[in-house]
């Protein structure tokens, strides 16, 4: 992959997105930074232009608004210099399912899933045609564990993982790398925006450590990168168990335990 390939990063004004911008700029990539806060975007862009001598464009966009989303989609479809998409924009929310309003649930699903898949859909055909490029989707370990109690948020992140794994199977033979990154709790503003006190969390990872680890996985071309997972064999075992389960599914035959034995 050309080191000068432009990288488009959503949710780029702070946190994980901003650190991705810094790291890709350090690698010599030009950038397109997308977020709602134009003041923060411009400050980051100015800093990166000065420190790394790269071109940085900014797109102010709220990806839950269809007009803004279509603008970013058009940039991904039409700008042939963009070879890497970092689908980072996302949100969380506090409270149990019955405490969350219908509107807040719809907003969360729109940002965490609809925007992400539409942006991937906008760039993927062009990357396949080029036979090169990458899509990085930021998920969460919460998507593996309904036990964490964040049902809607976790469901959106389970979607991100499933989509990423499916796209990897579809697109990697055509030269396009797809990576799912699954952080655990990371020190970003997402917690405050969700109404969650970060100080109540027992453990939390620093953003720079998370992104640096994710980029190790990126360079290794891992389809799924889980920086907080200490034993890689655990993930391998989970995938092996999943494959074994699939082998037990008989599409034309009801399992014996559900048959009327009376």
What are these regions (language model features)?
Residues 11-15:
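Conserved glycine-rich cofactor-binding loop
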Residues 27-44:
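Conserved glycine-rich Rossmann-like NAD(P)H-binding loop of the short-chain dehydrogenase/reductase
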Residues 140:
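Residue(s) in the substrate-gating loop at a strand-loop-helix junction
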Residues 88-93:
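Conserved NAD(P)H cofactor-binding loop of Rossmann-fold oxidoreductase domains
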Residues 96-98, 104-107:
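Substrate-binding pocket helix/loop in short-chain dehydrogenase/reductase
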Residues 180, 196-235:
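C-terminal helical subdomain
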Residues 120, 156:
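Active-site helix of classical SDR
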